């Protein structure tokens, strides 16, 4: 189902498509010794080790004391989010970006981040970053190519991707032999994250994006563009699931490799098709013990 009908302007990322994927259910492990373990009933005959009760929240909640006690109610969550947005200058609402940005605004956003450090930098072999390497990295910013007016394009992240200080994979370090912290690594974005694209690198492989939490460079093949309403509306309504484990993965599905074994990190929120027919497969896979979720793809 193609949701973006127009071709991206200025050769922005591939058009956005939403695909279905199976999110595997992991049985949470709890150690509430004082709470008796409920009887899960007879196992299902067609899936080894699976009981129907395992697929319900009630079964797991019954193993906990005070399972229904809220940590934060809706009003408290909204208040905390409001404080975060007010106090953290990096939190931004990309929905409120103007339809046109001046070249100066775009360049300022880029150069505020992409400023070469005054200290010496080394590669992973302990060699100082050569002047010609630095020049090539800085030239790839493409600042002279920013048009006088820029219309932000909107996109969804399709896979876990690094946010970088400069449009390069070149890893740099402050100390010879200490390669724990890459000084060009800023943050990361995850499947379903929404971004506004305002510039492309000279080599065409990187995009400068604004996300809710950060503005930085992301590899172009990690995002799929769509119209603003579709991108901002993704997952905004209807049922959803939030990953609470360190990571989760979609099911292996060779029929749709774009969403096969896709890593989903803690905090990722995806729209779920709660009314998916039990007997109907998803990408050739039986969905009985999984959540059927929508994921953006290129």
Features from the language model and the residues they span:
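N-terminal secretory signal peptides that target proteins for export/translocation
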Residues: 1-12
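Bacterial N-terminal signal peptides
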Residues: 17-27
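Sec/Tat signal peptide C-region and signal peptidase I cleavage site
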Residues: 29-33
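Boundary regions of SH3-family modules and the immediately adjacent low-complexity/disordered segments
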Residues: 34-164, 169-180, 210-250, 254-257, ...
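Short, charged beta-turn/beta-strand-edge "cap" motif at the junction between a beta-strand
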Residues: 199-204, 275-279
